Regions:
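Alpha-helix N-cap and loop-to-helix initiation/capping positions
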Residues: 40-44, 72, 76, 108-116, ...
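N-terminal small/glycine-rich loop or linker at the start of catalytic domains
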Residues: 19-37, 95-109, 132, 137
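Active-site groove signature of glycoside hydrolases
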Residues: 125-145
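N-terminal binding-site loop/beta-alpha segment at the start of enzyme catalytic domains
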Residues: 1-92
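Short beta-strand segments at enzyme active-site cores
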Residues: 59-63, 94-96, 132-137, 167-168, ...
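Short, acidic/polar
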Residues: 39-52, 112-128, 176-180
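Beta/alpha (TIM)-barrel catalytic core signal, keyed to glycine-rich beta->alpha loops juxtaposed to Asp/Glu
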Residues: 3-12, 141, 145-328, 333, ...
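Short, well-ordered coil/turn segments that N-cap beta-strands
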Residues: 23-28, 56-58, 86-92, 130-134, ...
């Protein structure tokens, strides 16, 4: 049956300007990092994408190496785009990234060289069946490549018509400022930064948000649910179907489930219940409490999860007392897998 998007899909979704640009992003965006590779049935993926778009989620975020295996998320998304979303292309913001390991040999092992970045973009466009992406990111800072070379590659992507906007991900505040200045000198304004940010990973509050404000860049926070830790999944032990028990679940480390972390998670869950929200809904609302955060990037393994998370939008405000109580448990949890590139180090 031909997909027909819901006519009222935009009504309940807040759309925020991305930094000082004219582009608006939905308050909640859908990331395809997990659950859109070949291990997930296409029918399940299709249901998730339809549910998201019908809820007003107009931004789908990918990267060249999303899967598993690498590249499969983009291939599968291209199929869904062809079958369901081609008539809605101009209502979508589609992004991809390059910078992590992708293909064999010295030019595919990641980084920020012009060779790797632009070859990756061409491959991504081919996999998705697109002429351009709306946003193209440098996926990580590369200390082995001059920043001017990496930003030059991003500028070329815009100048060649292969990307409308460019951004960076997991860059430190100082490198963000440098990157923004370089791009502006090349006639391309940096649009957005994509850092990890959650109740248990607050590093961007130190100086990155200020850097984004100063440079006019938006912020889309990924891993806002700490890869599922900030949901009800682990409140009473580890379920059998948890990512930590699945092939390809290596990004979720056993250390994340420390007793200290679980103690804070349970306390945060109690605070969420008092607000009439699930823990996941409160975690999303909390990330969005700062106006400098344009969008919260969610992952999901089912359409029902997307519907639940979209429910966070019904209560985005917090009282001063709630924020004070949350701060007692919104502490560093040792879950930032992207700490090294975010501090200018080699991964």
């Amino acid at each position: 049956m031909t997909y027909q998007a819901k006519p009222a899909r935009f009504d309940a979704m807040p759309y925020r300007f991305c930094g000082k640009s004219g582009l608006k992003l939905p308050a909640i965006s859908l990331g395809l990092w997990h659950n859109f590779g070949d291990a997930t049935p296409l029918a399940s993926q299709r249901q998730m994408l339809r549910t998201a778009f019908d809820a007003g989620i107009t931004h789908f975020d990918l990267a060249n190496n999303y899967g598993p295996p690498y590249g499969s998320a983009e291939i599968n998304f291209g199929e869904h785009l062809r079958r369901d979303f081609r008539p809605y292309r101009d209502q979508l913001v589609i992004s991809s990234k390059a910078g992590w390991d992708m293909w064999p040999g010295p030019y595919g092992t990641g980084g920020g060289s012009r060779k790797h970045v632009l070859a990756s973009l061409d491959q991504s466009l081919q996999r998705m069946g697109l002429d351009y992406v709306d946003i193209f990111y440098s996926h990580r800072f590369d200390p082995d490549t001059p920043l001017e070379e990496t930003m030059g590659a991003l500028a070329s992507a815009v100048q060649q018509g292969k990307a409308l906007y460019v951004g960076i991900s997991s860059y430190s505040a100082s490198k963000t400022r440098e990157a923004a200045a370089l791009l502006k000198s090349m006639g391309v304004r940096p649009l957005i930064h994509q850092p990890s940010y959650s109740l248990l990973n607050r590093w961007i509050e130190d100086d990155l948000l200020d850097a984004l404000d100063d440079t006019g860049m938006g912020c889309i926070a990924f891993s806002a649910l700490a890869q599922g830790l900030l949901t009800d999944k682990y409140l009473n032990g580890t379920p059998r179907d948890a990512r930590i028990n699945r092939p390809g679940g290596g990004s979720f480390k056993p250390d994340f489930l420390s007793e200290a972390n679980l103690k804070h998670v349970r306390a945060l869950n109690d605070l969420a219940q008092a607000r009439g929200q699930s823990l996941a809904q409160m975690a999303i609302a909390w990330v969005l409490r700062d106006a400098r955060v344009t969008s919260a990037l969610i992952g999901a393994s089912s359409a029902a999860q997307i519907t639940e998370l979209a429910g966070a939008l019904s209560q985005l405000s917090f009282s001063a007392g709630e924020l004070q109580a949350i701060d007692q448990h919104a502490v560093e949890g040792g879950i930032n897998l992207w700490h090294k590139p975010s501090t200018d180090q080699r991964p």
